[in-house]
Amino acid sequence: HDMKLILTLFTCLFVTGCAYAQNFSDYFTNKTLRIDYLFTGNADKQSICLDELSELPVWAGRRHHLSELPLEGNGQIVMRDVASGKVIYTTSFSSLFQEWLETDEAKEVTKGFENTYLLPYPIKPAEVEITLRNNKREVSANLKHVVKPDDILIHKKGLTHITPHKYLLKSGNEEQCIDVAILAEGYTTSEMETFYKDAAIACEALFSHEPFQSMKNRFNIVAVASPSADSGVSAPKQGAWKHTAFGSHFDTFYSDRYLTTSRVKAINDALAGIPYEHIIILANTEQYGGGGIYNAFTLTTAHHPNFRPVVVHEFGHSFGGLADEYFYDEDVMNGLYPLNIEPWEQNITTRINFASKWEDMLTKATPVPTPVANKAKYPIGVYEGGGYSAKGIYRPAFDCRMRTNEYPTFCP
């Protein structure tokens, strides 16, 4: 089901709509409007603050199906033309802030998290509405603001001071292809040759998997040599703090392997002037870990033996919006998905609205739920355990890339 979902996303990106669909050039110019927000709050109350607007030299995102939402995500952005009220662009995302809200710390303290989104640059004034949803899929925060394209305080970025970079795969221009940037984290200036080699391995790992393998000619991959003062990344549990480009660290939410960064603006600043839609950050460390957040970033360790499968797994989160299919009895995120709500992620189900998921891919004889003993007979089934919970959440295959590193492929 992972594969089917990613193929659907490709269709959204490349197939032009009906004759009545809006043309990109009706409302937009070939530039990017970058919006930096702060998501703030605690377990009880959340809000969204506007931070800064920037203009980037080109638009690398989709030019078709502009007003359609490929996936719901945990948050949505809708851009409307002020004059007509028409929806001219929409996108969705998930955020580290929303994951943090499920932790015990969020019951005690109010925090703020940086979040950055890229939108096509409007020709005329546009209203941008951003909405966060909780895990019951209810609106938890909302902000509307008008962007005037000729506002002198919109910061023009990416014209100078562009980070050194090399293309590992160039299949076409940014208009025709999905642009993925691989960023260096914890590599000093003298370690950049190692970074370029690591980025090439990540690239090769990604395209050894379907459906990416068949779609390779639709991708551009650029390795961006963002330098760090220190080598390696921070590991708070070991008391090791490093001065790096994006301040990445293990032990996010006190979970050993959860490697993330909260410096989202610094990440996007390092990419200004380079066309990008998706971000993979490689951390120069042998310690095991990673993280992937839908339409935000993938972060993974480059020198652990499982680097290849982990980068593919995490890209499944950030590119495909896929959920984790693994579960532990004591998982810190256990309870993230309420069992009486159908999750928006396409590869897990609570069976509240299973018809919206992979029900149509099951054979008539498939038992629901599917016993583990029958896993060989039913490659696609409804296997209990997923989304960090052993009970009440189901996954489409006994094993796949979103569950274990050992499994060679995504589910069908």
Named regions from a protein language model:
Residues 27-153:
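Beta-strand-enriched, solvent-exposed domains that form extended recognition/catalytic surfaces
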Residues 218-294:
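Active-site-proximal segments of metallohydrolase catalytic domains
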Residues 152-210, 223-233:
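Fold-level signature of zinc-dependent metallopeptidase catalytic domains
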Residues 194, 291-314:
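Short pre-active-site segment immediately N-terminal to the catalytic Zn-binding motif
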Residues 1-24:
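Bacterial Sec-dependent N-terminal signal peptides
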Residues 315-331:
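Catalytic Zn2+-binding segment of zinc metalloproteases
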Residues 186-189, 227-231, 285-289, 305-307, ...:
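Solvent-exposed loop/turn segments at secondary-structure junctions
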